Amino acid sequence: MSSFGTARLLISNGGEVALELTVEPWAETHRMLPEQTWAIVTHSPAADGPWSGTLRGDEPFQVDHQPGSVTVWVNGNCFHLSDTEENAIDSADWHCPAQVASS
């Protein structure tokens, strides 16, 4: 049993051109090609949250869309970014717990 809460958000680019994905508050920017789907995973120190929220309390994520870009505000204490096969897109060490592949 883990001692932290985990939240997962899938982001897909269903358009015909690349999108800029920015993960805040780290200002990490990545280019998502058309038809790509990525997972953003974050962790909270407590097993059931709480998440600080951006506009409303207890929300692990906030998503803002602008033409050509998507910004995801992560309200946990770290994040992992991977594709749908759990291959790391951002391998930076954000002091997150090790990811365990799901079966």
Language model segments and positions:
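Basic/polar N-terminal segments that are highly enriched at the extreme N-terminus
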Residues: 1-2, 103
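Asparagine-centered strand-capping/turn motif at beta-strand->loop junctions
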Residues: 3-15
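Residues that act as N-cap/strand-start positions at coil-to-secondary-structure junctions
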Residues: 3-5, 24-26, 57, 66
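Short loop/turn positions at the edges of beta-strands in beta-sheet-rich folds
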Residues: 13-15, 34, 66
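Short, structured beta-strand/loop micro-motifs enriched in basic residues and often containing a Trp
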Residues: 16-23
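Histidine-centered metal-chelating micro-motifs
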Residues: 18, 38, 69-70
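Intrinsically disordered, low-complexity Pro/Gly/Ser/Thr-rich segments with frequent PxxP/GP/PP motifs
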Residues: 24-47
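Terminal connector regions
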Residues: 43-103
